[in-house]
């Protein structure tokens, strides 16, 4: 069957799926539209029902596409173009992995047809599609592939690469062979006419360049688009059925939603039949001019559901809450804990009368995944069913009607008030079908405190909140238009009691479509949890910003005398710096720490240190895999990136990672601006003198953070000390404009080193809340200061103010830094900003005492002493780049930057090695590093060593670190040499440190336990 490759189809719109019913068309045109719709439906039904049993499935696709290009487009070009493109994409994706069609001329012509029709104006995407075909082996035995690909390269003026490509086809004996030779001969004639002549040196270069061009890094866009929307599809039968018998609520933003949506084919067929049949013969034809639909919403957006309660003797009350989640069936009842557990995939419910065997379900899922590509992508919004609740608790549901034509009729019936008195049950229900062991909360007691002011986050506070909800109710009249449903941004009140109202129960206020399938990645139940939780956290009765982050509130704090000793809990200490350009640090006294709004007695910092090994066991299961290394091409010059910190470059890298960031368990994306960072800073500065602290509540996680103080402020970020509702201290890094790069790097480090104990020496990111204008990175908090703080502390202890750090302590910290650099370099991460104030002190106090002699393997308690490496905002992931890639700085360099940066030369790992030298120099000399360059081009320290230092050790270290990029035969990273020097230092410590190093560490450990920020700059020396 022949395809006209010269035909062109112009114009394409992605959001039309049927023939538009034009106004003023003739009856013959309507009949023609109806016939085309019926033919289209017949083809779609054959694709779904007959394709799997056909000997030649490509033949059906060809018939369908030729019918569209010859009949459909002639009647309606716009809709026909979309249908043609969708059909071609489905055909290419469905057939591409069938070995029979790899070198079928018909299949190759469809690829070329698609490229010429829809990608002709995009050279990058056209070339990427050809590269994808080449790597998949599609058409590589056919001359047509090389001819068309060479034409594309020729038009882009890659003349020699196009010639080499034709020669490659001839070497592979592609058919028809004689035609390919003629094409090659004609092309050589054209090159001679253009005076493009090859020489002996240009031929190998052309072949190497062609090999580089044939390496594809991402699949074509339409394939990535399909994978985004279909591979994460999950069947409704595999999750708790919370969507049955509920009305249509406001549709939640779909994190995994693509522009193409999988829809029910049966509903689509019925809709097409309905559109074609609704043409009255005696109807008056209207004017064909299009009118602007101001309030029309073709997607039939869902509407909020709420309850109106009339309690005798009280004002009418409206509760934005979906009670159909509590009573999904006549004989079933769930409490709020069970509902949240089911939403998160932690609670499985076996419906009565609905038995599905595992074999049947698995077979059905496999068939659906295989045929999913054949289904036209549409959005299906079926009408909602009336909610069903038990008779004893039946209440009226007020929601906007989806059918405007019947709004008047329903309005009269819905506004009727039915007064019913009952108590909403919140007791836990024990069910045998638990996906995990979930603890059952004790039932509420009637003797719970009813005090309106609760200052501690305790059982009494929980009972108080629940008791406010467990009261009699009745359904009053509808809410008036003038009623205020907004919330203020900031409120100051004297305690921590919060009302259980709309802004606090947002996660349960939405009604889901019972027929709508949730799109999610089938990886882990935890991933599905975040997806479904995010979709259920929107309500249309609140201001738009309340969807994403609750107002920041301030509370007046008072010191509480500890009565009950809280259990000791170990947590990892956190980042307390804002990264580079740290300017100021706000005073934090023991009074502010002890005046917690959450706990009676905050946990001592020395007892809140978590072993990273435990954390790594609980790490996310579906972190992105390490991207495979690029294929190294011999004699290829290294890639040099001029502006390595460019936001556009980072955005490009993040757009190509797989899986994408929004699938990370601790990544929470909000599709809205927040504009709260400056307001948060202002309120904190005003309220800290009154001992009132703002509270930040992230709705997608339910995490509450009380801002305790300001740790640091830079050019783009401010770091706050925040206390969680569990009493854990966290560092909250607020960055404007929003940034995700540091979170990505830290997530990659945690995943790639998940089996290594070195993670205890790297700060951990708990979560990232990303808004359009700013980002909130939640980090673990380290309370013992930085290496720079330790240096300044040692200087202050000296009488003349010029004290320096103990040499053995310098060696110990140097060894710990080398261990971290070795590991992150092994997994392709360059820190890029290594300096004293990005290294935190980690002197944990576990039960095991510190041994008298230094142990390099960490025994005798030495594994609990070390550093934290923080601030990965200027880091690089070398696995995203070709091997040997280097960077050129576009910022002004100084003595704190490596020699390559200052000389304007390319660099890579040299930045970390020079940074390590700078940290060591600061510890030894008590001042920032200064270097001079010798006549032979090598660098050395400007300041000489003291006579009593171990010059044989420090000389070797600085010579290697300062000149890491000088040796021509030195391959970076030079991990083996770093390990060799580290072993030298460790051997010296084991042989000579004896009790001295232990005593020094215990001494500074005691000093740092009382360490408090005094609001003075860190970088002072």
Swiss-Prot record:
GO BP annotations, alphabetical order: centromere complex assembly; macroautophagy; meiotic sister chromatid cohesion, centromeric; mitotic spindle assembly checkpoint signaling; protein localization to kinetochore; sister chromatid biorientation
SMART domains per record: Mad3_BUB1_I (SM00777), S_TKc (SM00220)
Cofactor field: Mg(2+)
Regions of compositional bias (Polar residues) in chain numbering: 19-35, 517-528
Domain BUB1 N-terminal: 47-212
PROSITE patterns hit by this protein: BUB1_N, PROTEIN_KINASE_ATP, PROTEIN_KINASE_DOM, PROTEIN_KINASE_ST
Binding site for ATP: 715-717, 837-838, 871
Bias (Basic and acidic residues) ranges: 569-580
Catalytic activity, as annotated: L-seryl-[protein] + ATP = O-phospho-L-seryl-[protein] + ADP + H(+); L-threonyl-[protein] + ATP = O-phospho-L-threonyl-[protein] + ADP + H(+)
Cell compartments where the protein resides: Nucleus; Chromosome, Centromere, Kinetochore
Miscellaneous information on this protein: Present with 414 molecules/cell in log phase SD medium.
Subunit structure, interactors included: Part of complex consisting of MAD1, BUB1 and BUB3 after activation of spindle checkpoint. Part of the BUB1-BUB3 complex, composed of BUB1 and BUB3. Interacts with SPC105 (via phosphorylated MELT motifs); the interaction occurs when part of the BUB1-BUB3 complex. Interacts with SKP1; the interaction is direct.
Protein name (Swiss-Prot/TrEMBL): Spindle assembly checkpoint serine/threonine-protein kinase BUB1
Gene: BUB1
